[in-house]
Amino acid sequence: MHKRTYLNACLVLALAAGASQASAAPGASEMAGDVAVLQASPASTGHARFANPNAATSAAGIHFAAPPARRVARAAPLAPKPGTPLQVGVGLKTATPEIDLATLEWIDTPDGRHTARFPISAAGAASLRAAIRLETRSGSLPDDVLLHFAGAGKEIFEASGKDLSLNRPYWSPVIEGDTLTVELVLPANLQPGDLRLSVPQVSYFADSLYKAGYRDGFGASGSCEVDAVCATQSGTRAYDNATAAVAKMVFTSSADGGSYICTGTLLNNGNSPKRQLFWSAAHCIEDQATAATLQTIWFYNTTQCYGDASTINQSVTVLTGGANILHRDAKRDTLLLELKRTPPAGVFYQGWSATPIANGSLGHDIHHPRGDAKKYSQGNVSAVGVTYDGHTALTRVDWPSAVVEGGSSGSGLLTVAGDGSYQLRGGLYGGPSYCGAPTSQRNDYFSDFSGVYSQISRYFAP
């Protein structure tokens, strides 16, 4: 994972800003896309620093045994049921979750803060994240308490006391490797004996989420899938903007520690500063506890058509911090989140239309099938307002070639506006399609953005 240079970021911003300014003024039921102006904080994108860079990691920590291989295989079926997220991690619990802070090696920084490091490991894990409970004996945790997280990669993520809740565990970012190193930083007026720390469970990934520079899932999708960069529209400003609005989602269930993948889209809005509105599927995020664990992966695509893993975009960026649920309708499978952290520079706020989609429309989908690098599918809307698998007000899309798969859930159904820009019209629920499917099964179903817009319109304007 590499940081964009200042000049490259400015170039992206300038080009996209020009596209935004050329867009028609949005009406009451639609809005053109726009470029991101604010930049993500280093702490939320893996560019934090240890408070005590040269400190050793304490021997005291928590170790989890590897899960049975059969359990790992059973958790990640090749063809998950429609309307279910793709599982990529399994939960492991321990009967002894407490860590005695007095046993850690504490070192003070020059400004008087107290620091210590400890490991959380799981045998054989390719990637790992941990549920952490940290609280003072009086209850509330000061905002200036810091936690730093690192794995085998170069990334160091940061959380503060205000990110941790007394009501539920805080799930760390996903790190590479089988050992998560945690640095705990306490303000000068807080002593280790004032705190209680426990790690009740971890989420265990058998395959690396970040292997060799974000090659996770690379090539794992079906043979009929098309790299986003291979689309005939690739290289046009409108299409490239649309791809920059799409992110891979990784989230964890606090109930069992299982981790899952979906796809989501950043949506434009008229607020100043912009709100980080993020569209996906209700079946991906079931409750606020799960939304709080969300991390999004941006710019995960190849830079060459049908390129190998070496062509993965070097600007891939992970954003941590979770999200809040603004709207969720399980029956319609609609979901609107608000990311708690600002996405990285270079992302795009996708335009949208709340006008009902017309039967016969040409639909486009940019998604992450099986967690693979970004793919593109194009199809025809063959039915609107239909019921499928117990869900209502869905839009059916027929695929002539490339389809969608597990991990694509929540990805946006896009249409092209009169000015050539893309507009979001719904999100993927699922269906019977797969590479090699007969014509009768080469179709999938999307939620309808227009059907719930009256419920969510207040979030898109001041």
From Swiss-Prot:
Annotated SUPFAM superfamilies: Trypsin-like serine proteases (SSF50494)
UniProt GO BP: proteolysis
Residue runs in coiled coils: none
Protein name stated in the entry: Lysyl endopeptidase
Alphabetical UniProt keywords: Autocatalytic cleavage, Disulfide bond, Hydrolase, Phosphoprotein, Protease, Secreted, Serine protease, Signal, Virulence, Zymogen
Class in the EC hierarchy, top level: hydrolase
InterPro entries attached to this UniProt entry: Peptidase_S1_PA (IPR009003), Peptidase_S1_PA_chymotrypsin (IPR043504)
Family label: Belongs to the peptidase S1 family.
Signal peptide: 1-24
EC number, UniProt record: 3.4.21.50
Function recorded in the entry: Lysine-specific endoprotease. Involved in corneal virulence.
GO molecular function list: serine-type peptidase activity
Keyword Protease (UniProt): yes
Active site: H283, D333, S409
Residues that bear Phosphotyrosine: Y429
Disulphide bridges, residue numbers: C224-C435, C230-C305, C262-C284
GO CC terms, sorted: extracellular region
Reaction(s) this enzyme catalyzes, per UniProt: Preferential cleavage: Lys-|-Xaa, including Lys-|-Pro
Localization (cell): Secreted
Propeptide: 25-211
